[in-house]
């Protein structure tokens, strides 16, 4: 036969599984739940402990019972009597006196009729349950015997009420089988004498309240916990249960005997003298101990069997979560307590906690009742750091909605509120996204990175190393006949290593010179200024210092002026080298005066431009020129970090036979080494060799050093930026990003300013200055046109000639005009094929003229378009209001007679009352009779409705007028 389970054994011994599990836990036995099987050893221990506890309990019971009853056997069983006895022995409390008055001599007999063991145990457990519920103490097994005495005291008042309640009706249906406890020990006559001294029922009512709180301190709820003493069980009679409560006469004291024991109502035998207390349980419904599940001692034994409605000893309304009437009456003690005690017991219970304890014995589905609120769907909002939309410059609207967890129409509606008509497939830029996502509690983050940013992030080496001074990069510009090449040769001969450099051909358009103090200066040779202009167009400064070479005998030439304009556009400091001062006709002062016209003022005249007088032929003034270059470089504080990966600019590039793409690089920062991966513009590759300006192979090149590089996959463009990257993957990524950006720029080219678009541009306030590149056939025409254009300038609009020269229109002019967002004007000259192609590619407007006044007139009209037009008001006519009509859903219509001029449908209207302006608006309707009219002439009648205005009175006058924009003309002219 299999081992019995806990709940099966509990049923056998007449206990609830919960009560038995509590005992097992107190005894620290290895049993986990009520469904666990009990091993024979464990079962034997439980039986022994239950038997031992019952004996000890019985010993206490006879003491009090014997004192109160004549039959010692029955007295031994009655546990409540010892409680009263102990309390009376300690101090004769009002409870004892009350009992004396309340219970006559028959009371002991009623007690003798004590209930079976099960009932006695439950009666003893009831008071303990009340205290346990209120205090919820942690019970220890070893406290069981120690707490016996307090329980006796606490049970005393219970005992007094118990006989009143049920002693008469209980005639010992199951004779007590525990006569063995020593009755002589506590048979003192004190309890017997105390019984007759019990006060009247009313006194008892008061004393019940006092007694429950005034019994010995150990009996109060605040005393040591008594949950250890559950009850006493007779294992030899586990299965025996009284079939029904016997009927008998009740002693006087509040209850009257009545028939039908099991059908006894809660208050059928309740008299008016009975003290108020908890509601009595219905007849037949057992009053169980709330903590242990035992049946109270004053109830018949049958209720030990649980019913579906009385699970755990409680009538519990599951919907309202309230306790039924049987819950408070946990035992005789509870039945005899006052209303205040009732409230304390009820309040001490937590319905939810009670259910949690009970859920052990309930079906699984009921567990959800406790977590019903927790099971509700909660609307969660992502935390702030998760509500971030990462945008790669642009994002499709549908993708944005999906990213934010929204519906696309929600974003469309929000965009419409912002005045943007959108659809699901529309690409939104970052600015638009950043405008709408905050409306939904999100934040936009642009994760787009340009190729330069990617290259910068992938830079390697010691990026935090202290920067060191780098050689300055100097560009020499000027007219070809002014000794530029001779000056470069003189500077090269001034090199410390002049013996080596003198006979070596310059391989590239850049070279380094070491001066006397050991520092280096890098010079760039840019014939035609092509590379320099390309660099400026890309927004990069190719050089740190610009040297303008001017011949002292020739003075300023057109190409000299062009070079100065390029240097100014690049924003680099300028040093003017006046060459050929050894010639007889040299006049440096005249050159200084000519350059002041271009805002190049020498230092001795109060300006900021350095002038150096040199002779490339006799090599005079070269040292002073180099010192001035060094001084300007020191002021600029040119520094770089040689310990990081290299970066710089492409000076020039070409395709050579046997070598492939060859690029001349100028390292601006870091170091370039052989074997590294390089990205120059959109071209990538690996550095196969480095050659310096003397044609020598080198392994590395630091900041400010020009080198020739082999290994690129194609020829890059002059002025492109180059970067050294860590690996080929990064090089490919940077190259592809730059190609994508170039394709996007080509697909949507920036709108260039043409002469026809000047007016529209300035209307929007984008342009207030007209940049012009002017070319003419002769110098006289050039001066005349320059003077006329200067006269056209006004404080509001200005014609700025950024470059003017004699000769045809070339590619350099187109690039310069493109950079300045201007136009090119040619007088008696034509652009060459290269310039035409360049102008078409860049979108630069080129205009050529043969008559000077035609050129001036068109420029005057274009600049006049830059002026904001004048607003002129023209009065059309006047009408007098002779009648007023109110038309439903239309408003007020004024019946008018046109007394002057005419009234037009699209004109504005001004309402005059006594020649004072009352309202000014637009005509909403103009009718003659019932027909709409475009205009009504003088002498005719008409109906006029004013838009959004109805306060028209007879006698008012209406003035029709229109506003016209009149283009302004420049006050200056070419007269």
From Swiss-Prot:
It is found in: Cytoplasm. Residues 469-639 form the tr-type G domain. Residues 525-528 are annotated as: G3. GTP binds at residues 478-485, 525-529, 579-582. Residues 308-318 have a biased composition (Basic and acidic residues). It comes from the Bacteria. Keywords: Cytoplasm, GTP-binding, Initiation factor, Nucleotide-binding, Protein biosynthesis. InterPro entries: EF-G-like_DII, EFTu-like_2, IF2_II, IF2_N, P-loop_NTPase, Small_GTP-bd, T_Tr_GTP-bd_dom, TF_IF2_bacterial-like. Residues 503-507 are annotated as: G2. Residues 615-617 are annotated as: G5. The keyword Protein biosynthesis applies. SUPFAM superfamilies: Initiation factor IF2/eIF5b, domain 3 (SSF52156), P-loop containing nucleoside triphosphate hydrolases (SSF52540), Translation proteins (SSF50447). GO terms for cellular component: cytosol. Residues 579-582 are annotated as: G4. CDD domains: IF2_eIF5B, IF2_mtIF2_II, mtIF2_IVc. GO terms for molecular function: GTP binding; GTPase activity; translation initiation factor activity. Residues 73-94, 193-202, 209-225, 324-336 have a biased composition (Low complexity). Its main location: cytoplasm. The keyword Protein biosynthesis applies. Belongs to the TRAFAC class translation factor GTPase superfamily. Classic translation factor GTPase family. IF-2 subfamily. HAMAP family: IF_2_B. This is Translation initiation factor IF-2.
């Amino acid at each position: 036969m299999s081992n019995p389970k806990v709940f099966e054994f509990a049923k056998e011994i007449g206990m609830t599984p919960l009560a038995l599990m509590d005992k097992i836990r107190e005894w620290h036995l290895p049993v986990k739940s009520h469904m666990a099987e009990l091993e024979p050893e464990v079962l034997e221990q439980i039986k022994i402990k239950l038997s031992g506890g019952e004996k000890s309990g019985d010993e206490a019971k006879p003491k009090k019972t014997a004192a109160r009853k004549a039959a010692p056997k029955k007295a031994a069983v009655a546990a409540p009597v010892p409680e009263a006895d102990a309390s009376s022995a300690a101090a004769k409390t009002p409870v004892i006196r009350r009992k004396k008055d309340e219970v006559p001599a028959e009371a002991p007999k009623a007690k003798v009729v004590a209930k079976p063991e099960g009932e006695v145990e439950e009666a003893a457990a009831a008071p303990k349950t009340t205290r346990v519920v209120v205090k919820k103490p942690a019970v220890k097994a070893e406290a069981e015997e120690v707490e016996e005495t307090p329980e006796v005291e606490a049970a005393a008042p219970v005992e007094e009420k118990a006989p009143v309640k049920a002693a008469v009706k209980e005639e010992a249906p199951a004779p007590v089988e525990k006569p063995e406890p020593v009755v002589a020990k506590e048979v003192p006559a004190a309890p017997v004498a105390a019984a007759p001294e019990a006060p009247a029922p009313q006194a008892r009512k008061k004393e019940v309240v006092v007694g429950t709180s005034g019994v010995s301190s150990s009996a109060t709820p605040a005393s040591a916990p008594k949950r250890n003493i559950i009850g006493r069980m007779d294992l030899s009679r586990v299965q025996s249960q009284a079939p029904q409560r016997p009927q008998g006469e009740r002693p006087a004291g509040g209850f009257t005997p009545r028939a039908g024991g099991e059908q006894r109502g809660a208050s059928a035998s309740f008299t008016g003298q009975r003290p108020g207390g908890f509601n009595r349980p219905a007849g037949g419904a057992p009053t169980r101990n709330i903590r242990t599940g035992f049946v109270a001692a004053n109830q018949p034994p049958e209720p030990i069997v649980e019913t579906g409605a009385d699970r755990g000893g409680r009538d519990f309304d599951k919907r309202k979560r309230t306790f039924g009437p049987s819950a408070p009456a946990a035992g005789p003690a509870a039945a005899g307590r006052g209303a205040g005690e009732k409230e304390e017991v009820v309040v001490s219970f937590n319905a939810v906690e009670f259910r949690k304890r009970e859920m052990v014995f309930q079906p699984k589905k009921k567990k959800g009742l406790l977590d019903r609120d927790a099971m509700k769907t909660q609307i969660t909002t992502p935390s702030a750091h998760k509500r971030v939309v990462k945008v790669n410059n642009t994002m499709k609207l549908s993708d944005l909605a999906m990213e934010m967890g929204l519906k696309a129409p929600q974003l469309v509606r929000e965009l419409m509120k912002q005045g943007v008509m959108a659809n699901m497939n529309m690409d939104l830029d970052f600015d638009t996204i950043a405008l709408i996502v905050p409306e939904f509690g999100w934040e936009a983050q642009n994760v787009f990175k340009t190729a330069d940013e990617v290259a910068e992030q992938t830079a390697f080496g010691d990026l935090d190393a202290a920067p060191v001074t780098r050689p300055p990069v100097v560009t020499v510009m000027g007219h070809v006949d002014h000794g530029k090449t001779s000056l470069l040769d003189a500077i090269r001969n001034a090199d410390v290593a002049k013996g080596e450099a003198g006979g070596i051909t310059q391989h590239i358009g850049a070279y380094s010179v070491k001066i006397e103090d050991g520092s280096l200066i890098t010079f760039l040779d840019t014939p035609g200024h092509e590379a320099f202009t390309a660099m400026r167009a890309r927004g990069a400064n190719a050089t740190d210092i610009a040297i303008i070479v001017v011949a002292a005998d020739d003075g300023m030439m057109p190409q000299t002026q062009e070079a100065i304009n390029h240097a100014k556009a690049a924003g680099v400091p300028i040093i003017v080298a006046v060459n050929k001062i050894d010639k007889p006709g040299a006049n440096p002062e005249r050159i200084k005066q000519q350059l002041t016209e271009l805002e190049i003022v020498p230092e001795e005249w109060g300006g900021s431009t350095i002038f150096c007088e040199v002779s490339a032929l006799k090599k005079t003034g070269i040292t002073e020129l180099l010192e001035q270059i060094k001084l300007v470089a020191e002021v600029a504080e040119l520094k770089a970090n040689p310990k990081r990966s290299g970066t710089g600019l492409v000076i020039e590039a070409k395709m050579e036979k046997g070598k492939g793409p060859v690029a001349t690089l100028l390292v601006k920062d870091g170091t370039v080494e052989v074997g590294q991966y390089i990205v120059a513009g959109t071209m990538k590759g690996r550095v196969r060799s480095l050659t310096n300006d003397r044609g020598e192979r080198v392994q590395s090149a630091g900041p400010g050093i020009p080198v020739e590089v082999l290994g690129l996959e194609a020829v890059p463009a002059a002025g492109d930026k180059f970067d050294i990257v860590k690996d080929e993957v990064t090089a490919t990524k940077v190259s592809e990003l730059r190609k994508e950006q170039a394709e996007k720029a080509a697909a949507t080219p920036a709108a260039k300013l043409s002469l026809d678009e000047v007016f529209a541009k300035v209307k929007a306030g984008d342009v207030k200055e007209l940049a012009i590149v002017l070319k003419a056939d002769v110098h006289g025409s050039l001066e005349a046109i320059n003077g006329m254009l200067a006269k056209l300038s006004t404080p509001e609009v200005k014609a700025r000639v950024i470059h003017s020269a004699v000769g045809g229109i070339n590619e350099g002019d187109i690039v310069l005009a493109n950079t300045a967002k201007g136009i090119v004007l040619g007088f008696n000259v034509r652009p060459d094929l290269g310039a035409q192609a360049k102008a078409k590619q860049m979108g630069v407007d080129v205009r050529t003229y043969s008559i000077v006044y035609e050129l001036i007139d068109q420029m005057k009209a274009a600049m006049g378009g830059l002026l904001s037009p004048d607003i002129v008001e023209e009065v059309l006519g006047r009408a007098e209001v002779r009648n007023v009509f109110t038309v439903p859903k239309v408003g007020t219509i004024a019946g008018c007679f046109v007394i002057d001029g005419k009234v037009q449908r699209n004109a504005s209207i001004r309402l005059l009352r006594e020649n004072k302006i009352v309202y000014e608006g637009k005509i909403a309707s103009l009718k003659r009779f019932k027909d709409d009219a475009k205009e009504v002439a003088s002498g005719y009648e008409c109906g006029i409705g004013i838009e959004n205005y109805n306060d028209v009175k007879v006698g008012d006058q209406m003035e029709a007028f229109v506003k016209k924009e009149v283009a302004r003309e420049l006050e200056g002219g070419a007269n």
